[in-house]
Amino acid sequence: MNIKPLHEGFKCPTKGSDKSGGYDLYMPEGGEVYHYNEIGLKVGLGFAAEIPEGYVGLILPRSGKGVNHGLELNNTAGVIDADYRGEWVVSMRMKDQGSLRWKAGDRLYQVLIVPVASLDM
């Protein structure tokens, strides 16, 4: 998959192991997200990528960040189509009233690259 870095803090997505389903996405810079009522906090992931034709990227919170810290995506799941060439962005929010701080290089989200059916309708 072709990846174009857009931020000096960019780190290429990686799999935690050969059996991991998703590629961990690294935050290019630090920040903090608070509880937002349906607004979310838009944060760029510091890169653009070419997902192969016939596939789609699904961005989801890493399990521990969602379960243990209440981190979620404002739009439930980020969908990156094969023809999208802009910067990958997440709209973050917290389920609870608390906040979550992160540092550059932290892994908050993951992307699953999955095949997509093309059907005549």
Give the ranges of each region predicted by the language model.
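DUTPase catalytic domain/fold
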Residues: 1-121
